[in-house]
Amino acid sequence: MGLMLIDWCALALVVFIGLPHGALDAAISFSMISSAKRIARLAGILLIYLLLATAFFLIWYQLPAFSLLIFLLISIIHFGMADFNASPSKLKWPHIIAHGGVVTVWLPLIQKNEVTKLFSILTNGPTPILWDILLIFFLCWSIGVCLHTYETLRSKHYNIAFELIGLIFLAWYAPPLVTFATYFCFIHSRRHFSFVWKQLQHMSSKKMMIGSAIILSCTSWLIGGGIYFFLNSKMIASEAALQTVFIGLAALTVPHMILIDFIFRPHSSRIKIKN
């Protein structure tokens, strides 16, 4: 699968703008540690984080189609949770499914020819069962979109409805990687930065947040660069780049989602209630 210039630009956006949003995870972890041995505990958390990411990365190459399915599923929840928390509505799960499924369910199906090639590169072969499962996801997503759109229009939350509709049309007309990069970088990552900065500015120093984010971003880029050059010795540049970016992103999403959606958001909510 050859990539156009616009596709390379989209991948660059994902790597240099989207990926760093997860680099704040060290500052997030540090902010939740209250004991005196904060550095030692932070090191332990980061080690577990790295082990989870590495384990998923290795599992991907043993069970690629299954791993891709898991990546799509957790991305629906992770993206949807971030969008819901940014602009809550009455129907929580239709909101999560509708927004989280745009780039993970709707995009693959509406751009099936292009995404089939992408999935084949990521899994080293065809994935017919995955497409059958995506059709089931699409049914759930369609119901979620209908319920969510009705509720947002009924309650006059027009900006939420228009964002969803705009993304649906973008996925229809734009190249798949452009749609993904647009959502991942300028909606999901921007909201994540805003949420984390707001939560941490009273708990952590700005220097520590920025410094740790820079260190982890640079480390991720160096590791990713090494993986890319290794893969490029075995396959063409475009395929090596796609595997590096998306399999690497999937591996990092697992510990990132656990930390953000299952630990940090509930932790932040408890602090907000106490205050």
Curated annotation (Swiss-Prot):
Mode of membrane association: Multi-pass membrane protein
Reported uses of this protein in biotechnology and industry: Could be used for high retinal production.
Positions with a binding annotation for Fe cation: 21, 78, 188, 192
GO molecular function annotations of the record: beta-carotene 15,15'-dioxygenase activity; carotenoid dioxygenase activity; iron ion binding
Activity dependence on pH, as recorded: Optimum pH is 8.0.
CC cofactor: Fe(2+)
Gene Ontology terms: cellular component: plasma membrane
Role, per record: Catalyzes the cleavage of beta-carotene at its central double bond (15,15') to yield two molecules of all-trans-retinal. Exhibits the highest activity for beta-carotene, followed by beta-cryptoxanthin, beta-apo-4'-carotenal, alpha-carotene, and gamma-carotene in decreasing order, but has no activity on beta-apo-8'-carotenal, beta-apo-12'-carotenal, lutein, zeaxanthin, or lycopene, suggesting that the presence of one unsubstituted beta-ionone ring in a substrate with a molecular weight greater than C35 seems to be essential for enzyme activity.
Protein's UniProt name: Beta-carotene 15,15'-dioxygenase
Lineage: Bacteria, environmental samples
Name of the encoding gene: blh
